[in-house]
């Protein structure tokens, strides 16, 4: 497992900081907590490709259809300034879709923008159960209580100390 504090400091915070210049509500403490909890639950901060040969990739387990929708409809068509902020993290000469598994800055940005499209506001920072419910309702295809409990458990074991 990548140490959660390193993932937070070197992946999540730089991306959210760049986004925060364009749209301040994209970089909040609650957003940092949501993103770290999401990566912990989705991949255990270790799997770049989905277990059991599914299509999702990156520490945030983003499926190609989700990437395409966020990239084309949310970034390119409606938020070019946000696209420019995310562009700082792209590798030149490689199509963005082909970078998703290995470029965790890009994956973090796509995941955060995916959450941003939700009209319901983020729960408060420190509301771990609320963040887990938010993940279950807006990132997962099914809001399964056992999965949300596991999100909370992983967060409490691996991420809580990052925010003290």
List the predicted regions and their residue ranges.
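Alpha-helical scaffolds flanking conserved acidic
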Residues: 28-37, 126-134
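Secretory-pathway/luminal and periplasmic proteins that interact with or process carbohydrate-rich
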Residues: 42-50, 140-149
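Peptidoglycan-targeting cell-wall enzymes and recognition modules
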Residues: 2-14, 33, 40-119
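Short, amphipathic alpha-helical segments
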Residues: 101-109, 125-129, 145
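Ser/Thr/Pro-rich, acidic low-complexity intrinsically disordered regulatory segments
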Residues: 1-24, 133, 137, 144-145, ...
């Amino acid at each position: 497992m990548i140490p959660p504090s390193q993932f937070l400091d070197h992946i999540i915070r730089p991306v959210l900081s760049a986004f925060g210049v364009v749209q301040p509500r994209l970089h909040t403490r609650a957003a940092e907590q949501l993103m770290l909890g999401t990566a912990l639950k989705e991949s255990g901060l270790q799997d770049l490709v989905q277990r059991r040969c599914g299509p999702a990739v990156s520490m945030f387990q983003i499926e190609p259809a989700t990437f395409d929708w966020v990239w084309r409809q949310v970034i390119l068509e409606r938020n070019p300034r946000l696209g420019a902020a995310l562009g700082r993290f792209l590798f030149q000469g490689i199509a963005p879709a082909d970078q998703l598994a290995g470029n965790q800055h890009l994956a973090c940005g796509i995941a955060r923008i995916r959450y941003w499209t939700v009209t319901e506001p983020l729960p408060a920072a420190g509301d771990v159960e609320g963040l887990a419910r938010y993940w279950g309702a807006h990132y997962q295809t099914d809001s399964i209580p056992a999965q949300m409990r596991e999100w909370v458990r992983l967060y409490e074991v691996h991420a809580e100390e990052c925010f003290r």
